């Protein structure tokens, strides 16, 4: 049932099928096409053409990815790392994170409230809450600020 990606038309069709499901970055789309058996000689021109036509857009992909992860409660550090692992340039990632309209501190408070809903009673609980929030991708500085301001209330 696997289609053979040995012509430019087949590679373009496979790329468009993937893009129809969700936005992809160029590196991710190239990797997926290679996994399906397409050669680099066919992939690069197809992706160049899709980019020229506006169907493959890195900035749109970054915006979509950041918004999706932010809605899931992930912080900027985790999002930045996930995007870097997907082969996107750091400068583009930083630009997209700077342009997004997410209030990271408000989101941090909301993630904390949904998960814990009560102040840490001792150092062990405070460390547990801090580890969870750090794993979600928030900076230790903002976590400390949140937990210390909460314990002062």
From Swiss-Prot:
One biological process term in Gene Ontology: regulation of DNA repair
Primary localisation category: cytoplasm
Signal sequence extent: none
Subcellular location, record wording: Cytoplasm
Keywords in alphabetical order: Cytoplasm
GO CC aspect terms: cytoplasm
Presence of the UniProt keyword Cytoplasm in the record: yes
Function, in words: Modulates RecA activity.
Family membership: Belongs to the RecX family.
Annotated HAMAP family: RecX
Name of the molecule in the record: Regulatory protein RecX
Source species: Pseudomonas aeruginosa (strain UCBPP-PA14)
């Amino acid at each position: 049932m696997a289609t053979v990606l040995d012509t430019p038309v087949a590679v373009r069709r496979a790329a468009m099928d993937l893009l129809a499901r969700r936005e992809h970055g160029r590196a991710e789309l190239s990797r997926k096409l290679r996994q399906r058996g397409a050669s680099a000689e066919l992939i690069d021109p197809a992706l160049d053409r899709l980019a020229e036509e506006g169907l493959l857009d890195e900035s749109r992909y970054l915006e979509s990815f950041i918004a999706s992860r932010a809605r899931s409660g992930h912080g900027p550090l985790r999002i930045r790392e996930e995007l870097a692992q997907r082969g996107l340039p750091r400068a583009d990632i930083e630009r997209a994170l700077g342009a997004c309209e997410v209030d990271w501190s408000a989101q941090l408070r909301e993630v904390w409230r949904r998960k814990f809903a009560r102040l840490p009673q001792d150092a062990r609980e405070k460390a547990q809450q801090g580890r969870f929030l750090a794993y979600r991708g928030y900076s230790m500085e903002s976590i400390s600020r949140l937990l210390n301001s909460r314990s002062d209330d």
